[in-house]
C-alpha cells in the first residue's frame, strides 16, 4: 500500500470517527397544538421537512466552510500548510451532489448464467436538501419557549423512534435520509478537521496531480458529510438531532413516502418543503408543556389519539416547575 493510499485511509477513518451514531438516541420534536394536530391529521404521523436555507440559523450549511478556513488560516500562518493546499481547500465550492439509490427493472447475467433481477442503480445526483429538527431532550424550557409558538410554553413534544429514518426506509427509493447529531463545540469541530487534514498536509505538495485530486476528494467528503452537522454554538441549547433528506431535483418523487415539493408561508418567507410519511408505531410518547392545564389536556389528548387509532402512545407531563402568569 502506498503512502498516499495509507494517508487517505487515515483521513477517511477520521471522518468516520467524527460521525455520531444516533440510533439509540431519543428523537424529540417540539410543536404547537396546531402542529400536533397537523402531525396526526391523517392518523399515521407525518412531518414537514423544510428546505435547509429556510431554517432559524441564517448560516445554515456555512459553518463547515468557516471552520475549515479558520483551521487552514492558522496552519498557513504557522507554515505547516502550503499556500497551494490552502488555496485548493478554501476554493472548494458548495455541492448539491448526494448519493441516491434506485430500483431498476434491469437484469444482470452473471458469468455462470445466473440472472440477477432488479439491479440497484447508484449515482451522485443534484438534490434539494430538507431538514426536520429534533432534540434529545423531551422536556427543555428553552425548547418549549422557542418552538411551542406561544408566550406561556403551550405545546407538545412528540418522541419518535429513529427506525422511521433507517436505511430500509429509503434504500432504492430515489431519495436518501440520514440522522445526524449537530456539533456546536468549536474544539470538537477543530479536532475533526485536524484529524482529516493533518495526514494530508505532509504529502500534498510532493504528490502527483492525480494523487492531489484524490487527497482533496477526502476533504470534499468531509464537507459533504458535515455541512449539515456543524452549527453555531449559540444554538447549543437545542441539543439537536436532525433528519437530513436529499431528493433529486430532476425527477418527481412517487414512492408515496415523501410528497412532491410544496410551498408554505412562514415568518414572511415562502418556504419549500416536503411531507415525510411514517408508520404509527414510530411514535413513542407525547410530552405536555409545563404550563398547560394538565388533567383536561391529558384526557382530551387521550381521546384524540384513540380516535386516530394511536392509543399506544404514552402521554407524559412536564417536570418543569414553572407557573403560568
What would you call each of these model-derived segments?
Residues 1-325:
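Partner-binding and oligomerization surfaces adjacent to conserved cores of proteins
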